[in-house]
Amino acid sequence: MAYDFPVVESVRSVLPVVDEFIIVAGDSSDGTDELLKVFDGEPKVRIIRTVWDTQTYDRGGMIYAQQTDVGLRACTGDWCLYIQSDEIMHHDALPVIREACAKYLDDRRVEGFLLKYVHLYGDYRHYIDSLHFAYPREIRIVRNRPDIHSWRDAQSFRVIPDFNGVDYDVEEGTRKLRCILLDALIFHYGWSRDPRCMVRKANHHNALYSKDYKPVEGVDYYDYGNLGMMPLYEGTFPEAAAERMAAYDWADFVRYDGPRPNIGKRYGVKYRVVDFIEKHILRDGRRIGGFKNYKLLKP
């Protein structure tokens, strides 16, 4: 795995709560196919092989949404739980998810569920506490309906009637899903990977968002900035991530002094004021502005 995604841990973290798990595996030469052999003989896991069409889906990371839809359309259950390969579900979330899916199965108002996020940063101890740099909640469970699609770069989902199968960033004629927020944590490891892999991952990822992107060259590892300026996560971590976290081996490539992390939405004056209001005045998880691609329902 050239980009150090916790694929195996991600899948294993949700297997106990699903009837079937579909892995959409694109064409690659980085050892992913070999890695996925760990699931040979696992009756719940089905792998769909695909070829990424980056000519058609050539902007804004829409190839991620298209690939997500491949998996979504292959699902057969009432509810579809979605997890990206850099996300790991907390074990305490599983009974919460199971109960909610049963409770709201026949309540057609509810089209999806939001999960709460912990975005780890730099190593496995620090996290991003800015609600505007990293989404604090997102849709990760949706009803299995043909008009519900992955949206934009697959961060979220949307109702898109008569979808043309190409324009995953369309807004006109679409609408947000009606969702309930669950007290269930999902951990994002996208910003807490080996800095040597992070350079390669950033180049590949950014190229999928812009055809004009010029890759960074001559850099051996990614600089996360001064991790001492980021808060420590004090809660428990997903059991499925225990082995990976115990193998942490890039302490020599991160620092705890010097210039701060390059997170404009955490350190800019505007966002520091907004963060203060949200955390110390509102104190209920609400955000001022920001990306909210859902209609929140009361349980």
Could you tell me what each predicted segment is?
Residues G61-A65, D69, H91-P299:
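Catalytic-site signature of metal-activated, phosphate-bearing donor transferases
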Residues Q84-I88:
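The conserved acidic donor/metal-binding loop of glycosyltransferases
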Residues E20-I22, R46:
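A structural signal for isolated positions on well-ordered beta-strands in alpha/beta enzyme cores
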Residues A25:
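Short beta-strand/turn micro-motifs composed of small residues
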